[in-house]
């Protein structure tokens, strides 16, 4: 039988109540003081409950007053906070990797709610007093112990009463140029789901989450690994709560501290660091420790006001299921909000627009924030559901705890169970290129999962280790294409003939060289470039990289496609054997790229 405790917290007269005080979260200018006193619940007959075998109870209740009104805070231990095979890694001074599997299941991190308030929630650490936050009557309150010798005093305060370390809004570094219009999103959301899609959306999703702490952050906290661990645990407990409305469970599968040095160069340019981190996860981390998503917590100050960056709609992709977050504030709630925001991007969620709302605010996916965020907006929930149905990411369907699986595995139910490597639904519904829908096993390595679109594309092959087809890759620039009529350039195969057909139609082709020799004149109609408004004539070797000339088939004309500024040969166009156009010159293809 699970033991329950009733703890009465009495509001006491405190000499500094309501004045400014320095807490772990920062300077707080208005607060209430309470003194928790544990009172064990009694069994029938007045007999006291026996002490539990574990250090921390599975459930607890706390009664106290907020603004003079009594409330009861119900807490349940977050049993799924750590994955069953959770590990911790740090490095010796000589660079030797040290990995352990510490006993973390008897932990002190809780979720909860205010009794008789349907929409309330709470995130509490009970390791050393009560620390965290709870929602009460639509407002968020924070609680933490006061550092007073031989005292059980705690402070309760609101976010608005904390003096910000920096008034500058925190900014997500994700730049979005592919926002759908409101109209297109609305049309998509109005489509009727099939029963199978509805079941898939309702199934609980699981993300095995790996956190890396870089060397700057390690040194900032005075090389104190236990303190860093507690900070990360509290963050993940908060992140876990924020994703519950989306039916996603976040389980920490690993924590790694770069205690000797960074494993790649962490730079102030967030986009560069994100790319490096994704490559490190793909080539170094995944071969030694499985995970669905990884985040880098860093002590570096990113350029501008950026505090985080992530790829959009990239969950389960080996080099893109990552995000980077700056540990920019002592307040755990702020950094945890950024971690949640960036993981939201990985789950296909864009930044909220002005029309997106959530209660209480601010919304998690706002691009700029100065306060902790606790709720996803209706826009975010809709985009997440659309991402699930569109991309069907496989890695979030397997439960991290094998003990939770009690029913026999069924191939085709979208749930990765014992004996299965993947599950993409029925063969008719499966949209995974590297999962065998009939066997629920990964397709073998070298199985083609994406055909080459043309000469300048490359086919993609399954890895045999994932249900996802690898990221689309291209032929290198300069690779011959279209029967040696051109050379690949940024996915295309530019040729003078194709340029004429595109501009004038299928009855046209490129003109003979005699027409291009006119480009040596450098007049209004024929030139290779411009400098300070003056047209520059072409050198003899560069004439095919200047003004474009086309000829109607079965004629001898030299036509210039109509354009006031002239149509020039496109960059990368073949201008001779082993030669391509670059900035109005015909250069060797080997040196051009």
Curated annotation (Swiss-Prot):
Residues covered by the Disintegrin domain: 408-477
Positions annotated to bind Ca(2+) 2: 410, 413, 415, 417, 420, 423
Q: Which GO terms describe its cellular component?
A: extracellular region; plasma membrane
Looking at its record, which EC class is this enzyme?
Answer: hydrolase
UniProt keyword annotations, A-Z: Calcium, Complement system impairing toxin, Disulfide bond, Fibrinogenolytic toxin, Glycoprotein, Hemostasis impairing toxin, Hydrolase, Metal-binding, Metalloprotease, Protease, Secreted, Signal, Toxin, Zinc
Residues of the active site are 342
Organism classification, top ranks?
A: Eukaryota, Metazoa, Chordata, Craniata, Vertebrata
Report the domain of life of the source organism.
Eukaryota
Which tissue types show expression of this protein? Expressed by the venom gland.
Q: Which residues form the propeptide?
A: 21-191
State the species of origin.
Naja atra
The motif D/ECD-tripeptide: which residues? 455-457
Q: How is its activity regulated?
A: Inhibited by EDTA, EGTA, 1,10-phenanthroline and DTT. Not inhibited by PMSF and SBTI.
* Glycosylation sites recorded in the entry for this protein: 319, 490
Q: Which cofactor does it need?
A: Zn(2+)
Q: Which family does it belong to?
A: Belongs to the venom metalloproteinase (M12B) family. P-III subfamily. P-IIIa sub-subfamily.
Specify the protein name: Zinc metalloproteinase-disintegrin-like atrase-B
Q: Where is the Peptidase M12B domain?
A: 205-400
Q: What's a GO biological-process term for it?
A: proteolysis
> Record's Pfam families?
ADAM_CR, Pep_M12B_propep, Reprolysin
Q: Where is the signal peptide, in residue numbers?
A: 1-20
């Amino acid at each position: 039988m699970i033991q329950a405790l009733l703890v009465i917290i009495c509001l006491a007269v405190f000499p500094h109540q309501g004045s400014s005080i320095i807490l772990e979260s920062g300077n707080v200018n208005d607060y209430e003081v309470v003194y928790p006193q544990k009172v064990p619940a009694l069994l029938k007959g007045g007999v006291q409950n026996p002490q539990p075998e574990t250090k921390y109870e599975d459930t607890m209740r706390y009664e106290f007053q907020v603004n003079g009104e009594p409330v009861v805070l119900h807490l349940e231990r977050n049993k799924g906070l750590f994955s069953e095979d959770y590990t911790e890694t740090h490095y010796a001074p000589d660079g030797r990797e040290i990995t352990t599997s510490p006993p973390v299941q008897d932990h002190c991190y809780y979720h909860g709610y205010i009794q008789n308030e349907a929409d309330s929630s709470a995130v509490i650490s009970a390791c050393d007093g009560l620390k965290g936050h709870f929602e009460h009557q639509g407002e968020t309150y924070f609680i933490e112990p006061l550092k007073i010798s031989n005292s059980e005093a705690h402070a309760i305060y609101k976010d608005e009463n904390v003096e910000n370390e920096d008034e500058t809004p925190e900014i997500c570094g994700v730049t979005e140029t592919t926002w759908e219009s409101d109209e297109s999103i609305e049309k998509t959301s109005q489509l009727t789901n099939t029963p199978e899609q509805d079941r898939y959306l309702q199934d609980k999703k699981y993300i095995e989450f790996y956190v890396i702490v870089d060397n700057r952050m390690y040194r900032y906290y005075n090389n104190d690994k236990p303190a860093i661990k507690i900070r990360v645990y509290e963050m993940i407990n908060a992140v876990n709560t924020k994703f519950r409305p989306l039916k996603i469970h976040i389980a920490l599968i690993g924590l790694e501290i770069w205690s000797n040095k960074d494993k790649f160069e962490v730079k102030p340019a967030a986009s560069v660091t994100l790319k490096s981190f994704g490559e490190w996860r793909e080539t170094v981390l995944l071969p030694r420790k499985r995970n669905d998503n990884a985040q880098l917590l860093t002590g570096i100050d990113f350029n501008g006001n950026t505090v985080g960056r992530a790829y959009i709609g990239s969950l389960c992709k080996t080099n893109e299921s990552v995000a980077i977050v700056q540990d920019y504030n002592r307040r755990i709630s702020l950094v945890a909000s950024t971690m949640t925001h960036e993981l939201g991007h990985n789950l296909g969620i864009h930044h909220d627009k002005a029309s997106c709302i959530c209660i209480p605010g601010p919304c998690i996916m706002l691009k700029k924030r100065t306060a902790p965020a606790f709720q996803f907006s209706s826009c975010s929930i809709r985009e997440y559901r659309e991402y699930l149905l569109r991309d069907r990411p496989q890695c979030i369907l397997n439960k991290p705890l094998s003990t939770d699986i009690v029913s026999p595995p069924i191939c085709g139910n979208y749930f990765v169970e014992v004996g299965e490597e993947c599950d993409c639904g029925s063969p008719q519904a499966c949209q995974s290129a590297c999962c065998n829908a009939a066997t629920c096993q990964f397709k073998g390595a070298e199985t083609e999962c994406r055909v080459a679109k043309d000469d300048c594309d490359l086919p993609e092959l399954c890895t045999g280790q994932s249900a996802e087809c690898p990221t689309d890759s291209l032929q290198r620039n300069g690779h011959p294409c279209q029967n040696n009529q051109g050379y690949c350039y940024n996915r295309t195969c530019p040729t003078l003939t194709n340029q004429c057909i595109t501009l004038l139609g299928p009855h046209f082709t490129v003109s003979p060289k005699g027409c291009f020799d006119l480009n040596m004149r450098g007049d209004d109609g024929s030139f290779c470039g411009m400098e300070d408004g003056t047209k520059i004539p072409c050198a003899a070797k560069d004439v095919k990289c200047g003004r474009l000339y086309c000829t109607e088939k079965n004629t001898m004309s030299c036509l210039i496609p109509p354009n006031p500024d002239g149509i020039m040969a496109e960059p990368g166009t073949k201008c001779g054997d082993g030669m391509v156009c670059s900035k109005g010159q015909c250069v060797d293809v080997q040196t051009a790229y």
